[in-house]
């Protein structure tokens, strides 16, 4: 077995180190195949050391350009991979070829498993992928690698990332490989139930990011007998994430570059609201347009849901706790609109796990990142209470608890929820955002900047002093942090005016460039794309 692993070309050591970030591994280099195949070994190890529970392997690079791909490992309960196993994965991905089998055995022994590789409890892994051309080949190579370890592999084919989370969770709950259709049946059934109560099914235009969303919307519409009430704006031949998708809309602060957006049909459509997904359907951004584009990001979605769910709890006279978990990138106006006597607002560090763990501290925990990734967590105490009631408010809460994914943001589930609850774009206009600006700076080593839990720079301390002076002079706030998914430093600034927000962001970005060995072009704002 050891020799078989060493001889496998798919398992050769990558030329550069790779590390499991907030979105798993992502790359566009020639090492991509080997990084993903080595990382898939962790899914086998996690399964065989945990009574053969089914572990998920999702091949996707989400909102990244089409030439990228990546891998996310899904734990037995549908959660993201535990941090301890992330560290194990980095060891497996980056070790020398002759040490690969030895490192795998070390992990087995650390889990009190004395079996040899490929022996003992049989591992079980399920695969899924997005629509990238490279996905099928990568899945086939992973299947080949895992086959050498006597690991059972089932392939769900093209799925959304949240769909695979759902399927893994359901597989282990029912102790069987469930049919792929179970996911869509759950959404269709609950959407039908919710819209029949609220009488809502807001028509929306859709930006699919030229990704898997198009396929899944057609599948869902088929189950709903053509009643989903939507229109896709993308060209069927469009390139994944190119000038479109949730990340493009959010970061560029503009509507996607789609020919259909300039049509008279869209400009005259009632409410003119569009939902923009990302490549693997775990992010959702709403916008109006195409002219005078107004963007409703994760902050707007969180505030709408918080106020709506609060009203439901008030109607049933519930004393359940309700919390809203936002990001340090969230706009201060979103925090200010939530009354402190009704909500506990918590700020979480970037990374989905941080948001989910904070949300689970409440009976109802609403969490959203500004990028449109978010969900609502319901405690068992909350579910028990709402199950006892028979009012309309109880019924809506029961359905929401079934639709919102408890482990990860599901943009498709969120989409149908908003369709059923909203009457128009006005429902998302709960506050007026303070002007803000986000820039990225490339430096020699992004990890040379150390920040604490509140995004205060610890090293170099002089950088934080500069940030404080600039923020005070312009009456705003700003912070910097190394990106968890890209080799850049992110700079955020927020001020009472757009001009000051831009100026503050530029000044801080320049300090980062000057003090931390910036490389390439100096920071600047491109206004030509507006």
Swiss-Prot record:
Alphabetized UniProt keyword annotations: Carbohydrate metabolism, Cell wall biogenesis/degradation, Isomerase, Magnesium, Metal-binding
GO biological process: carbohydrate metabolic process; cell wall organization; UDP-N-acetylglucosamine biosynthetic process
Family annotation (CDD domains): PGM3
Cofactor(s) annotated in UniProt: Mg(2+)
GO molecular function per UniProt: magnesium ion binding; phosphoacetylglucosamine mutase activity
EC assignment: 5.4.2.3
Lineage: superkingdom: Eukaryota
Residues noted as binding substrate in the record, renumbered to the chain: 369-371, 481-485, 490
Residues bound to Mg(2+): 62, 278, 280, 282
Task performed by this protein: Catalyzes the conversion of GlcNAc-6-P into GlcNAc-1-P during the synthesis of uridine diphosphate/UDP-GlcNAc, which is a biosynthetic precursor of chitin and also supplies the amino sugars for N-linked oligosaccharides of glycoproteins.
Name recorded for this polypeptide: Probable phosphoacetylglucosamine mutase
